[in-house]
Amino acid sequence: MRMWKWLAVVALSMAWTLAFAKDKDEIKPAGTSNPPPSELLSGFDRYEVKPAVLTGVYAGQEINETALASFQRNFDERVGAWVAEQNARPARHDPARTLVIEPRIDKIRFISGGARVWAGAFAGSSRVLVALRLVDQATGEVIAEPEFYQHAKAMAGAWTFGVADNNMLIRTATMSLDYLKANQDQAVGAPTGWEGK
Protein backbone atom coordinates (compact mmCIF):
# COMPACT_ATOMS: atom_id res chain seq x y z
CA MET A 1 0.00 0.00 0.00
CA ARG A 2 2.85 2.37 0.82
CA MET A 3 4.31 1.77 -2.65
CA TRP A 4 1.05 2.88 -4.32
CA LYS A 5 0.94 6.01 -2.18
CA TRP A 6 4.54 6.80 -3.09
CA LEU A 7 3.82 6.30 -6.80
CA ALA A 8 0.75 8.51 -6.52
CA VAL A 9 2.79 11.29 -4.91
CA VAL A 10 5.46 11.01 -7.60
CA ALA A 11 2.85 11.05 -10.38
CA LEU A 12 1.10 14.09 -8.91
CA SER A 13 4.40 15.90 -8.45
CA MET A 14 5.31 15.26 -12.06
CA ALA A 15 1.87 16.40 -13.20
CA TRP A 16 2.05 19.69 -11.31
CA THR A 17 5.60 20.30 -12.52
CA LEU A 18 4.53 19.77 -16.11
CA ALA A 19 1.42 21.86 -15.66
CA PHE A 20 3.19 24.93 -14.36
CA ALA A 21 6.56 24.70 -16.09
CA LYS A 22 7.07 27.45 -18.64
CA ASP A 23 8.26 26.55 -22.12
CA LYS A 24 11.79 27.65 -23.01
CA ASP A 25 10.52 28.88 -26.36
CA GLU A 26 7.22 30.30 -27.48
CA ILE A 27 5.86 28.06 -30.20
CA LYS A 28 3.95 30.03 -32.81
CA PRO A 29 4.33 31.14 -36.44
CA ALA A 30 5.21 34.64 -37.61
CA GLY A 31 1.58 35.39 -38.51
CA THR A 32 -1.76 33.95 -39.55
CA SER A 33 -0.98 33.50 -43.24
CA ASN A 34 1.95 32.38 -45.36
CA PRO A 35 3.05 34.59 -48.24
CA PRO A 36 2.75 33.16 -51.76
CA PRO A 37 5.76 31.57 -53.43
CA SER A 38 7.94 33.78 -55.63
CA GLU A 39 6.75 31.82 -58.66
CA LEU A 40 4.01 29.34 -59.52
CA LEU A 41 4.86 25.83 -58.43
CA SER A 42 3.45 24.48 -61.70
CA GLY A 43 6.62 25.90 -63.29
CA PHE A 44 8.48 22.87 -61.95
CA ASP A 45 8.40 19.44 -63.58
CA ARG A 46 9.83 17.32 -60.80
CA TYR A 47 9.81 17.31 -57.01
CA GLU A 48 12.50 15.96 -54.72
CA VAL A 49 11.50 15.46 -51.10
CA LYS A 50 14.18 15.51 -48.40
CA PRO A 51 13.66 13.67 -45.09
CA ALA A 52 12.09 15.78 -42.34
CA VAL A 53 14.44 17.01 -39.62
CA LEU A 54 14.25 18.49 -36.13
CA THR A 55 16.13 21.74 -35.57
CA GLY A 56 18.07 23.21 -32.67
CA VAL A 57 17.54 22.02 -29.12
CA TYR A 58 14.58 19.89 -30.19
CA ALA A 59 16.79 17.38 -32.04
CA GLY A 60 18.05 14.32 -30.20
CA GLN A 61 15.30 14.24 -27.56
CA GLU A 62 13.61 10.84 -27.59
CA ILE A 63 10.02 12.10 -27.43
CA ASN A 64 10.68 14.64 -30.19
CA GLU A 65 12.35 12.01 -32.38
CA THR A 66 9.23 9.85 -31.92
CA ALA A 67 7.06 12.77 -33.01
CA LEU A 68 9.36 13.37 -36.00
CA ALA A 69 8.97 9.75 -37.11
CA SER A 70 5.18 10.07 -36.86
CA PHE A 71 5.22 13.32 -38.82
CA GLN A 72 7.46 11.72 -41.48
CA ARG A 73 5.05 8.81 -41.94
CA ASN A 74 2.11 11.15 -42.39
CA PHE A 75 4.11 13.46 -44.66
CA ASP A 76 5.10 10.51 -46.86
CA GLU A 77 1.49 9.31 -47.06
CA ARG A 78 0.28 12.72 -48.18
CA VAL A 79 3.03 14.77 -49.81
CA GLY A 80 5.07 11.74 -50.86
CA ALA A 81 2.13 10.15 -52.67
CA TRP A 82 1.26 13.42 -54.42
CA VAL A 83 4.89 13.97 -55.48
CA ALA A 84 5.01 10.47 -56.99
CA GLU A 85 1.98 11.35 -59.13
CA GLN A 86 3.50 14.66 -60.26
CA ASN A 87 6.85 13.07 -61.10
CA ALA A 88 5.14 10.47 -63.30
CA ARG A 89 3.89 13.20 -65.65
CA PRO A 90 5.85 14.21 -68.78
CA ALA A 91 8.28 17.10 -68.19
CA ARG A 92 7.48 20.41 -69.89
CA HIS A 93 11.02 21.74 -69.75
CA ASP A 94 14.31 20.45 -71.11
CA PRO A 95 16.15 20.02 -68.87
CA ALA A 96 13.36 19.35 -66.38
CA ARG A 97 13.04 21.85 -63.54
CA THR A 98 13.13 20.33 -60.06
CA LEU A 99 11.74 21.79 -56.83
CA VAL A 100 13.38 20.47 -53.67
CA ILE A 101 11.03 20.18 -50.68
CA GLU A 102 12.78 20.31 -47.30
CA PRO A 103 10.38 19.72 -44.37
CA ARG A 104 11.53 20.46 -40.85
CA ILE A 105 10.09 20.74 -37.36
CA ASP A 106 11.33 24.08 -36.06
CA LYS A 107 9.72 23.86 -32.63
CA ILE A 108 7.73 21.22 -30.80
CA ARG A 109 6.27 20.32 -27.43
CA PHE A 110 4.92 16.81 -27.79
CA ILE A 111 3.11 15.01 -24.97
CA SER A 112 3.45 11.24 -25.31
CA GLY A 113 0.65 8.73 -24.76
CA GLY A 114 2.43 7.53 -21.62
CA ALA A 115 2.50 11.04 -20.17
CA ARG A 116 -1.20 11.38 -20.98
CA VAL A 117 -1.98 8.17 -19.09
CA TRP A 118 0.00 9.28 -16.03
CA ALA A 119 -0.70 13.00 -15.96
CA GLY A 120 -3.69 13.54 -18.25
CA ALA A 121 -4.45 17.21 -18.86
CA PHE A 122 -1.84 18.19 -16.26
CA ALA A 123 0.84 17.29 -18.80
CA GLY A 124 -0.20 20.39 -20.75
CA SER A 125 -0.83 21.04 -24.42
CA SER A 126 1.14 19.75 -27.37
CA ARG A 127 2.28 22.25 -30.01
CA VAL A 128 4.27 22.03 -33.21
CA LEU A 129 5.67 24.45 -35.79
CA VAL A 130 6.56 22.86 -39.12
CA ALA A 131 8.30 24.66 -42.00
CA LEU A 132 8.74 23.74 -45.66
CA ARG A 133 11.72 25.13 -47.53
CA LEU A 134 11.05 25.03 -51.27
CA VAL A 135 14.22 25.42 -53.34
CA ASP A 136 14.89 25.57 -57.08
CA GLN A 137 17.43 22.76 -57.48
CA ALA A 138 19.19 24.39 -60.44
CA THR A 139 19.69 27.86 -58.96
CA GLY A 140 19.48 27.32 -55.20
CA GLU A 141 16.84 30.06 -55.00
CA VAL A 142 14.36 29.69 -52.14
CA ILE A 143 10.93 29.86 -53.79
CA ALA A 144 8.95 29.79 -50.53
CA GLU A 145 9.31 28.89 -46.87
CA PRO A 146 5.81 28.46 -45.45
CA GLU A 147 5.25 27.41 -41.84
CA PHE A 148 2.39 25.52 -40.28
CA TYR A 149 1.28 25.56 -36.65
CA GLN A 150 -1.01 23.11 -34.87
CA HIS A 151 -1.73 22.22 -31.27
CA ALA A 152 -3.57 19.71 -29.15
CA LYS A 153 -5.19 21.17 -26.07
CA ALA A 154 -4.47 19.51 -22.76
CA MET A 155 -8.02 18.26 -22.14
CA ALA A 156 -8.37 16.93 -25.70
CA GLY A 157 -5.11 15.05 -25.29
CA ALA A 158 -6.26 13.63 -21.96
CA TRP A 159 -9.68 12.50 -23.17
CA THR A 160 -8.18 10.79 -26.23
CA PHE A 161 -5.16 9.29 -24.40
CA GLY A 162 -2.78 11.05 -26.79
CA VAL A 163 -4.66 10.61 -30.07
CA ALA A 164 -5.22 14.38 -30.29
CA ASP A 165 -1.49 14.95 -29.82
CA ASN A 166 -0.71 12.68 -32.77
CA ASN A 167 -3.50 14.21 -34.88
CA MET A 168 -1.76 17.60 -34.84
CA LEU A 169 1.15 15.97 -36.69
CA ILE A 170 -1.27 14.62 -39.29
CA ARG A 171 -2.79 18.08 -39.73
CA THR A 172 0.58 19.75 -40.36
CA ALA A 173 1.39 17.14 -43.02
CA THR A 174 -1.99 17.81 -44.65
CA MET A 175 -1.42 21.58 -44.53
CA SER A 176 1.93 21.07 -46.27
CA LEU A 177 0.21 19.23 -49.11
CA ASP A 178 -2.53 21.86 -49.29
CA TYR A 179 0.10 24.58 -49.77
CA LEU A 180 1.79 22.69 -52.60
CA LYS A 181 -1.52 22.10 -54.36
CA ALA A 182 -2.97 25.58 -53.83
CA ASN A 183 0.08 27.35 -55.26
CA GLN A 184 0.37 25.38 -58.48
CA ASP A 185 -1.54 27.63 -60.87
CA GLN A 186 -1.93 30.73 -58.72
CA ALA A 187 0.30 32.19 -56.04
CA VAL A 188 -2.03 32.51 -53.07
CA GLY A 189 0.00 31.44 -50.05
CA ALA A 190 -1.92 29.58 -47.33
CA PRO A 191 -2.98 29.85 -43.68
CA THR A 192 -0.37 29.03 -41.05
CA GLY A 193 -2.95 27.53 -38.70
CA TRP A 194 -2.39 30.20 -36.06
CA GLU A 195 -5.60 31.62 -34.61
CA GLY A 196 -4.00 34.19 -32.35
CA LYS A 197 -4.60 32.25 -29.13
Where do the language-model regions lie?
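Bacterial N-terminal signal peptides that target proteins for export
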Residues: 1-8
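Bacterial N-terminal signal peptides
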Residues: 8-15
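A structural "domain/chain start" motif
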Residues: 19-77, 178-197
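Generic beta-structure capping elements
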Residues: 50-52, 106, 148-151
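Short secondary-structure boundary motifs at beta->alpha junctions and helix caps
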Residues: 58-65, 140-182, 186
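Alpha-helix N-cap and loop-to-helix initiation/capping positions
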Residues: 67-71, 120, 164
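A short, N-terminal amphipathic alpha-helix
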Residues: 75-85
